[in-house]
Amino acid sequence: MANMLYFSLLALLFMTGIASEGTISSGLASLKAKIDAKRPSGKQLFDKVANMQKQIEEKFSNDDERAKVMGAIGSLSTAVGKFQSGDPAKIASGCLDILVGISSVLKDFAKFSPIFSILSMVVGLFSGTKAEESVGSVVKKVVQEQSDQELQEALYGVKREYAVSKAFLDGVRNETSDLSPTEVSALGANVPVYQGVRFIAMVVQRIKNRKPRTESEIKRVLSMLELFTDLCSLRDLILLDLYQLVATPGHSPNIASGIKEVSNLGREEYKKVFEDLLKTNDKETYLFLSYLYPRERNEQSQKIFKFFDLMKVKYDDRLKQDLTGIQVFSSLHWPNYFLCSSKDYLALICTKPYGSLRLDKLNDGFYSIKTTQSNPKVCHRYGEYILFTHDRNDDLEKFNFVPVKLGERKIYLLSSKASPNKFAYVPKTAKGDLFFVDGIPSQLGYGNQGYFTLATDENEQT
């Protein structure tokens, strides 16, 4: 069977943990519950899932393999509802979910063929007509926002490339198709998405050439990044489907090999563009990072980071780090001054516990900052400075520790969910108050006053 090198574009995100046959059955039950069996395509998919359940329970005895199976099933379970929603953004997200899950079972294509069969069925729910409508909706909105005539013109070609390619796959996947394997291979070599990269390349070029410095510019770049993610996810899933079709005995191995190479075109160049955007040692990217990070902040950020990981984009490990725990918070400008549990400002002398605060990561990736007392106070923004209080202030008490580097030193900028464009800084005097300013402090003449350090207080961990 043809080598699976085509999938080298995907990170091998191996699922951890042990899944029993009962757990697999439970996962499949969850998948079946999300399938609309009243629709013809849904009924066919439902029956195939039921059959796959029997095969999996008989075939896999190794714990690691069962865990991989669960990874693929989990991706299908989340994707089916998105495919059936009719929402173009959710459909694109469903494609990405499948790409993430399938990366865990790529080592042995033959052994996991039942799962690939179901994948083909799920992809098949995305019919040719819906493909044209959905892809058109996904890209049209963002392209219109860019007011870019060249991109708008290229859009029409992209819609046709995707729709015709899906129509071809839906046709040959049909069990009544009388095409021979060699005919399928010949046709597969000429489906439009096989060659179509112009629009995606244009989107990347726009991102590369735009240095976002204002909130509106940053939001446009984020929209372009999301557009790129949607387009590549859709295209890669179509190519995956096409590869499955022609990488089986009887088809042309040369065509299968060609499909692998097409997927890799431009990948390294694209990765370099994204890695430049995520640099933590470049002051030009700091404001952008405050809008993209944390990765859990919204569906847009989640999708972009998930795709970056699939593309193996390199970035600062701290963008994945969880800072939850007891931390000592200080300023690079006044390294001996700490944000104390008993005060609302950086102080030279803190009462016990010495400069220790509790950080808790919230569902949206932002952090709450609390004192470590039995009846803790919560840190929040009050106007342009910070206070500790027992009152709740919603988004004003959600903070973002944006990881940056000064030389080789790993430090943080402090912003909030409510105002990602405003950053904390300390005055040059030793008073220690924390103020917020609109923009990156170091670019506004504040030097090191807007850089902060965090250190785990091992003695205060609970």
Swiss-Prot record:
This is Toxin CqTX-A. Heat-stable protein that continues to cause erythematous skin eruption in the patient and to recognize IgE after heating. Belongs to the jellyfish toxin family. Type I subfamily. Critical allergen and main toxic protein of C.quadrigatus venom. Has potent hemolytic activity. Is lethal to crayfish. Causes cutaneous inflammation in humans. May act as a pore-forming toxin, disrupting normal transmembrane ion concentration gradients in susceptible cells. It comes from Chiropsoides quadrigatus (Box jellyfish). Residues 1-19 form the signal peptide. Glycans are attached at residue 174. One of its GO terms (molecular function) is toxin activity. The keyword Secreted applies. Keywords: Allergen, Cytolysis, Disulfide bond, Glycoprotein, Hemolysis, Ion transport, Membrane, Nematocyst, Secreted, Signal, Target cell membrane, Target membrane, Toxin, Transmembrane, Transport. Its main location: secreted. The keyword Disulfide bond applies. It is found in: Secreted; Nematocyst; Target cell membrane. Contains disulfide bonds. N-glycosylated. GO terms for cellular component: extracellular region; membrane; nematocyst; other organism cell membrane.
